[in-house]
Amino acid sequence: MARLAVIPTIILALASSSPALSQPDTDAALLEQIRQDVSADRIEKDIRTLVGFGTRHTLSETDSETRGIGAARRWVYEEFNRISAACGGCLEVSYQSDFIEGEKRIPNRTEVVNVIAIQRGTMDPSRYVIMSGDIDSRVSDVMDYTSDAPGANDNASGLAGVLEAARVLSKHKFAGSIVYAGLSGEEQGLFGGKIMAAQAKEDGWRITGVLNNDMIGNIEGINGVINNTTARVFMEGTRMNETPEEARARRFYGGEVDSPSRNLGRYVHRIAEEHIPNLDVMMVYRLDRFGRGGHHRPFNDLGYPGVRIMETNENYNRQHQDLRTENGIRYGDVIEGVNFNYAAKLTGLNALTMAALSRAPAPPMNVSIEGAVSPDTTLKWAMPNVQGTGNLAGYKVYWRLTSEPTWTNSRYVGNVNEATLENIVIDNYLFGVAAVSKDGFESPVVFPGPAGDFYPFHPTKP
C-alpha cells in the first residue's frame, strides 16, 4: 500500500529572472534502439501462425492441437516462455482464467483464458504498465464458433504486437513492471479484460497505464484512404467511477479533459511526436469508436488509466465478416489485409511508451493547486513512499491554455514538493505535474485533484 515520502517543502518562484534548473537528458539512444529492434518479419510470422489456427472464437474447441482457441492460447503461452528463455527467465508466464455462463454471447459454462507474461521491475515492481492484444476472433455471426475466422487484423495484429514488444523490451531492465497480455473473450463481451482488471484490483496493482492494441495492421480504409503515417489513441474523459463529490469538484475546478487516461493518451502522442518518424497520433476524445468497445474499457470501468491504440482507417469489409466474395468485393479478415510494416510501427510506439513509462518514477500523488484572485499559481504534490523512488531526479510542472489539446509550457523545478508560477493566472490555464527520473524519463502529467489522480485505489491523503 502506497505511503507518502517526506520531501522538504521548497517554494520555488518561477519568475523570468530565476535561473532555470536543468532536467536530466532523456536516454534517447535506448528508445531508438528499441524502435529499431522491432521486426515486421517476426510480426508477420506471428500473425500467420495465429491465422493458421482456423478460428480462435472464444467458444471454439480447446482440445485440438491445431485448431481453435485452445491451441492458439497454448501457442501464445509457449511463445512467451521462449521469449523468457532468451532473457534468462525474465518473464513470469501464466494462464489467468474464470468460468463465464448465462451471458448473451456465452450462454453455457465456458472457461475464458488469458495468457499473461510479467517482466518485473527492478526498483518498483508493484507498479505496472500493461500492453494487451486479443486472442479471439469471429465472423458475421458472433455465435458461429466453427467457421474459419482468421482474424488477421482483428486481432492477430495486436497480439503479435504484444509478443514482439515482449521480445524487444525483455532485453532491457526497467524500474517498473511491464505486463504483456493476451486476452480472450473480447468479441463475446470483453470478458478477458474484466477478469484481468478485477484480479489487478484484488492484488493491489498500481497501474500507470493500459495500452490496448486492437487492430494495428490495416492501412486501406473503407473510405478509400490509404495511409500508413497516422494512428489513433482513444481515451476516456471523466472516470466511470467518479463520485458525486468528485463530480462537484470537477465542475468548479476543471478536469473534464484531464483524466489519467487523457494524460496517458497525451503521453503516447508525445512519444510518437518525438521518437517515431512519419507517425502522427490522432488523440480521440472518446472511450472508443462510436458506440463500440475494447479491452481497455474494463480497466477504465474500475478507475484505471487506459487507452486504445489502433489504425486510423478501418475497413469494415474485413471486420466481423464471413469469408466470401459478393459483387466483386472480397469480405473477411484475411492476411492480405494486414500491412506488416505498419503493424511494426505501431508496435514500436507501444514499446517506446512502455519503456519510457517504466523507466520513469511513479506519478506524483496528492497534486493540489491554489491561486484564486492572485497573479500567481501554486502547485503542491507528494511522491508515494514505494520502492523505486531512488531513480527520482525531480519534478516538472506543466501548463497550457484551456483550449489546447497538449501540454505546451513546462518548467523543471527539481526535487521539491511545491512550485509557484509567478504571473501565470490560474483562471487562464490548465496545470499538472510529472515526476522525472535521473535518466530523464517522465511520468504522465497529473492534473490536480481527484479528476487527475492516477491512484484510484490507494490512499491519497497523508
Predicted regions and their residues:
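Extracellular fibronectin type III
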Residues: 438-462
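Active-site-adjacent mobile loop/cap segments within catalytic or ligand-binding domains
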Residues: 51, 216-237, 283-359
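Beta-strand-rich modules
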Residues: 421-443
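Conserved aromatic anchor
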Residues: 375-390
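A non-catalytic alpha/beta surface segment that caps or lines the substrate-entry region
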Residues: 34, 42-120
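Short beta-strand segments within Ig-like beta-sandwich modules, predominantly Fibronectin type-III
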Residues: 409-416
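Metal-dependent peptidase/peptidase-like ectodomains
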Residues: 183-297, 302, 306
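Alpha-helical metal-binding/catalytic segments enriched in His/Glu/Asp
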Residues: 117, 131-132, 136-137, 141-190, ...
